[in-house]
C-alpha cells in the first residue's frame, strides 16, 4: 500500500511539472520558430541593368554583368509569351514588347499560332532582383517585368514571371523577400491570352494583401 501511494505521488508531481513547464516550452519553441522565419528571408537589390549594379557594387563589375546576362536568359525562358504583338502591347504598353524565337518547350498548337512570324512576343525585362554578392560566389538573380499600360494591374510595378509584385518599378531599392522568390521559375510552355498575365498579377496581389493582413492580425493578438 505504501508503495502504491508513493507511485501515485510521483505521478502527481510529474503531472504538475508537465503542466507548468509546457507554457515555457511553447514560448521557447515560438521564439525559435520566429527566428527560423526571419532567417528564411533574403536581402535583394533591384537593378535596371548591369551598370546600375556595378555602380552600387564597386569592384564587382564582372559579377554584375554575369548576373544581368543570366537574368536576361531567364527572362527569355520564363516571361509570358504572346502569339501576337498586339496581345503583348495590350498588356505591357507600346514599346515594351519584343520578338523571341519560338521555343521547343511551347506546345505545338501554340507554335502554330505564331507560324506566320516564326516567333512569339514577350515583354522586355524591366529590371531584375539580385541577391547579395558574397565573396567569390555568384549571386542569384530573378528577372522582373513592368507594364506601362495604365489599364493593366501590373502598371508601374515590378513583377516576376509568375505575376507576383515587388512594389513600384524603381531600381536601386533593397528589400527582403522569401528565399523562394529567387528560385527559378518554370519555363513558359503555352502562350498567354490578352490580359491573362494581368489577371495573374491581380490574383497574386490579392493573396499578398490577404497574407499581410493575417500576419498583422496575428501579431496584434500576440502583442
Swiss-Prot record:
Which residues span the membrane? none
Task: Give the record's family classification.
Answer: Belongs to the UPF0441 family.
* Biased composition regions of type Low complexity, renumbered to the chain: 177-193, 209-223
| Stored NCBIfam families | PRK11653.1
User: Segment Disordered: which positions?
Assistant: 165-223
- Residue ranges of coiled coil: none
This chain belongs to which protein, by name?
UPF0441 protein KPN78578_33850
Q: Which domain of life is it from?
A: Bacteria
Q: Which Pfam families match?
A: DUF1190
